[in-house]
Amino acid sequence: MALATLDWMSKDAERLAQCNHDHPQAVLGPQQLEDGRWVVRVWMPEASRVVLLHQGHEHALENPHHAWIFEGELSSNPGSQYRLRVERAGITHEQHDPYAFRQEWMGAMDRHLFAEGNHHHIWQRMGAHPHLQDGVAGVQFCLWAPNARSVSVIGDCTNWDGRHLPMQQRIGGIWELFVPGLGAGAHYKYEIHTQQGHCYEKADPYGFQHEVRPAQASVVASLKGYQWGDDAWLKQRDNRNPLEQPVSVYEMHMGSWMHGSWDEPYIEADGTPRAPVPAADLKPGARLLTYPELADRVIPYVKARGFTHIELMPMAEHPFDGSWGYQVTGFYAPTSRFGTLDEFRAFVDRCHAEGIGVILDWVPGHFPKDAHGLAFFDGSHLYEHGDPRIGEHKEWGTLIFNYSRNEVRNFLVANLVFWFEELHIDGIRVDAVASMLYRDYLRPDGEWIANEHGGRENLEAVRFLQQANSVLFHYFPGALSIAEESTTWPLVTMPTSMGGLGFNLKWNMGWMHDMLDYFELDHWFRQFHQNNITFSIWYAHTENFMLALSHDEVVHGKSHLLHKMPGSDELKFANVRALLTYMWTHPGKKTIFMGMEFAQRGEWNVWGDLEWDKLQFPEHQGVVNLVDDLNALYKSEPALWRNDFDSFGFQWIDCDDTNHSVVSFMRRDEKEGNWVVVVCNFTPEGHGNYRIGVPVDGFYTELFNSDGARYGGSNQGNLGGKFSDDWGMHSYGQSLDLCLPPLTVMVFKHDPNRQREAAKDEAAAKLGGSLG
């Protein structure tokens, strides 16, 4: 094989050796010379010998121009169908040449849509994809880093040396490289050399899997191959309006719900133990459960409690456990703490098989400064604003996305679609929406910049949220999009076509604060704070509200729900039961945080797990029973959920009895004409003959009583129900004479089929005697 006579440009060799080349395919791989001949140039750092294998022939390559550039002449273009036998440090291996594969991965339309901010499936192009090119298996890498001087793929395959696999720059700041021979499971990062001469090692922003913390590399993972079993669930979900369904959510943090033992590792399907992931230093010997173990334990538990959905605190990859998941570095990857991408999919799949929806906390408002993450990604403020007055949350130590940049919005909007399309989640809760909407959020005067109109509103963030919700509901009309928005920003749950942000639910932070403030009061002072109980109804229909008692209310010295309550243990438990029952009967969808369903005593601690030992005590088990029955009642009575968001669904009977701290109201279902009566006594004083007005004559069945013995109460009540009396009250022609136990909420329903004599005989039987 004759040596090529091409005068090699030494500057290209030096640029390659210094990781400073942005178009390696211009000089590497098959190259046609001016006279029509072909030369193959191979970049092989630290190799001592390279032999080209093609069509049954071996061609020893030489390196006359640089020690690491091997070249040889061929009579025709070999394309990508040649292999290289490489000797390095006494070891010989064969491989394909990455620079022989020249097919552009990102097409012109992909680049156009991405630059426009409208490529809703950009993850199918960006990132690392196991792929077959020209019949050769490998991994296609694609990265956006428009301000980088050069980018290399580094990993186990290069001994983490950026000189081996420089990437090819394309139009629009896209960098690509197909690496033959790699596959799923390969660890990698991008080595980015900046215009200023600095070098950063970055995880893949679009990586689908990452190493377990504290390691930081991305892991090649295929999105293909998992066989979903939830087609019927998804079809049903997207054919109905979730606002017209019961929604009862169990919010949980996977890493602190329950731990396993270090001495009892998870056993893989092939019988080998999986390396345990330590839970925390504060609990020696504890390990995190895996996705399969969590599926085995969480799903039956949540189903038994009767919840319709699980809300998972952020599951995207994050380096620090103490952030609870809210400081994300891997937006496109379920955290590897608990297992693999497909194991997370299987968790969701099993939830759907058991009739449980999955809501994910999504964090598009900020990201951490970790060196391997998005911060200063390509030597420029690529994902964040450069000015800290609009680009940084100093109190949180995080950076704010630059929503005015199309590609950044595209990254986030497509990420939302990704979690629904590839991982089949059913809803999102967007964290800290207020921090996105206001430029002066947690900022003193002088440390924020007004918008172009002189206001404090972040108009770019508004447009981003509107775009995200519009795209979400375009693809997934039955999805839930929930805003944690703590201010009075208008139209949060109005459609974007009407000027709203486009969410379909908003956490009712006002209700939560009013309720907790009220229930923390000494019982006898509650009469002076009746407005805390009643005020939420006056604005209940201004947004589509979700009532939430979340993780934020049981940390940082706030104490858990039980210990917010006044009085003895007996009174505390009665208060918890009353609060939860009032919550389930109040307009709005429901969310409670893990541990509240059994009245955990201690604060939530991300480093530990729940106080499962408390379930051996009857008072705690009683709260579990209460939640079980509340969810069953809630789902069986459309009056409690169908008209949550219009005024027809709620009617006060009496909200003015401040002396007794008693309120009563009706919940109504317009579609079927059903209605229930709710009576609440929020003091430890019972009332033997408490009368409320009702609209219809007849028998009122006592459907629910939070003082029931099954719940740990005193079991006082109304012997299953009461007939109304022809005694007008509260603007109604009929009334009920009720027994109201202390600190109790009761639910009644009119039964048109019950006759007075039959009810009288039944009551006598319950008393063990006759009623005159």
Swiss-Prot record:
Pathway: Glycan biosynthesis; glycogen biosynthesis. One of its GO terms (molecular function) is 1,4-alpha-glucan branching enzyme activity. CDD domains: AmyAc_Glg_BE, E_set_GBE_prok_N. Disulfide bonds: none annotated. InterPro entries: A-amylase/branching_C (IPR006048), Branching_enzy (IPR037439), GlgB (IPR006407), GlgB_N (IPR054169), GlgB_N_E_set_prok (IPR044143), Glyco_hydro_13_cat_dom (IPR006047), Glyco_hydro_13_N (IPR004193), Glyco_hydro_b (IPR013780). It holds the Pfam family GlgB_N. Keywords: Carbohydrate metabolism, Glycogen biosynthesis, Glycogen metabolism, Glycosyltransferase, Transferase. It catalyses: Transfers a segment of a (1->4)-alpha-D-glucan chain to a primary hydroxy group in a similar glucan chain. GO terms for cellular component: cytosol. Its EC number is 2.4.1.18. GO terms for biological process: glycogen biosynthetic process. It comes from the Bacteria. It is an enzyme of class 2 (transferase). Monomer. Catalyzes the formation of the alpha-1,6-glucosidic linkages in glycogen by scission of a 1,4-alpha-linked oligosaccharide from growing alpha-1,4-glucan chains and the subsequent attachment of the oligosaccharide to the alpha-1,6 position. Belongs to the glycosyl hydrolase 13 family. GlgB subfamily. This is 1,4-alpha-glucan branching enzyme GlgB. The lineage of its organism: Bacteria, Bacillati, Cyanobacteriota, Cyanophyceae, Synechococcales.
